């Protein structure tokens, strides 16, 4: 495995994307630790008939992959089969930061914080237009979870163009002991020890049908009323007030700077990821995880003392 990584760092990473040499090198990196058997299913396609089904069911150049995130293996696996451009999402902003393979792997063992200098951040729509021949991979949760739930999504997917296809992808592992929900050096050591001490791991991959982010004006025109409109005779000043309050709620922004309508769009993606992974959604995001990690770290230091 060390030799395979040496070949990648010294030579293969500089070769053009999608070449046979890159794929072979990445398959060696992912296969040597025992990650061989991959269970792949695609929405709307019967098992074993993916190549025979018409239409595009797999991510293609110019599209975006929105994947669940639990382990560094997510990144290695996606790099092996899709060779995408990885991105880092952040709370409170729709912009993302392009990452190299090594930077994406390193991000699994730390909590992302938006950089003070935002010159390196850009929307997904611009990244797709700059690289029309590549697939863009994003982890909208922004940080690995424990594999038992989908965290609250960051707003990064909202920066995609309404014309761009977004493929939800769920990645799970059996046994589920190579997840890295807690950042830090100890988590990295524990991950590598578990990975190398187990003979084999299975990747369960579920790819959903492509979705799109609705245009802002189209989303705003779907108010989804919560009350029945009275007759024109019964309509009065209070009906007008109620409509105005609903309109204000739809444009009012939360702590992440997104509106209620945009939150519904993110909920749609989160529901799909939860369905594909057969897990639950939780109302915890990266901010809550940061508080938990801080408390957990203090508790661990206290027990050691």
Predicted regions, residues:
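Eukaryotic N-terminal targeting leaders
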Residues: 1, 44-58, 284-305
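N-terminal membrane-anchoring alpha-helices
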Residues: 1-39, 292-305
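Catalytic core of membrane glycerolipid acyltransferases/transacylases, capturing the structured
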Residues: 15-27, 36-39, 54-118
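Beta-strand elements of modular eukaryotic interaction domains
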Residues: 27-29, 38-56, 126-128, 194-195
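Generic beta-sheet signal
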Residues: 61-67, 132-140, 164
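A Trp-anchored, charged/polar loop motif used as the substrate-binding/catalytic surface
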Residues: 114-129
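A cross-family acyltransferase "interaction/gating" segment
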Residues: 134-135, 142-256
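Cytosolic terminal low-complexity segments enriched in Ser/Thr and acidic residues
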Residues: 231-276, 283-286, 290
């Amino acid at each position: 495995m060390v030799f395979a990584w040496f070949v990648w760092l010294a030579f293969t990473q500089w070769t053009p994307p999608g070449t046979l040499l890159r794929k072979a090198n990445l398959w060696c990196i992912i296969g040597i630790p025992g990650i061989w058997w991959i269970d792949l299913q695609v929405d709307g396609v019967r098992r074993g008939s993916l190549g025979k089904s018409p239409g595009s069911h797999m991510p293609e150049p110019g599209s975006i992959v929105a994947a669940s995130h639990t382990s560094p293996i997510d990144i290695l696996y996606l790099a092996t089969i899709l060779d995408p451009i990885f991105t880092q999402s952040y709370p409170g902003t729709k912009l993302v930061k392009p990452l190299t393979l090594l930077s994406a792997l390193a991000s699994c063992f730390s909590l992302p914080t938006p950089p003070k200098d935002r010159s390196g951040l850009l929307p997904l729509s611009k990244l797709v237009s700059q690289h029309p021949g590549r697939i863009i991979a994003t982890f909208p949760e922004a940080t690995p979870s424990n594999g038992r739930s989908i965290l609250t999504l960051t707003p990064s997917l909202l920066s995609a163009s309404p014309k761009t296809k977004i493929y939800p992808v769920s990645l799970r592992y059996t046994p589920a002991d190579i997840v890295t929900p807690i950042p830090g050096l100890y988590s990295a050591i524990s991950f590598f020890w578990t990975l190398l001490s187990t003979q084999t791991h299975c990747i369960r991959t579920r790819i959903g049908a492509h979705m799109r982010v609705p245009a802002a004006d189209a989303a705003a025109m779907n108010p989804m009323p919560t009350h029945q409109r009275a007759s024109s005779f019964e309509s009065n000043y209070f009906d007008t007030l109620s409509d105005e309050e609903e309109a204000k709620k739809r444009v009012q922004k939360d702590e992440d700077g997104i509106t209620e309508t945009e939150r519904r769009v993110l909920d749609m993606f989160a529901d799909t990821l939860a369905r594909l992974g057969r897990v639950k959604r939780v109302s915890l995001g990266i901010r809550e995880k940061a508080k938990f990690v801080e408390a957990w770290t203090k508790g661990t230091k206290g027990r050691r003392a």
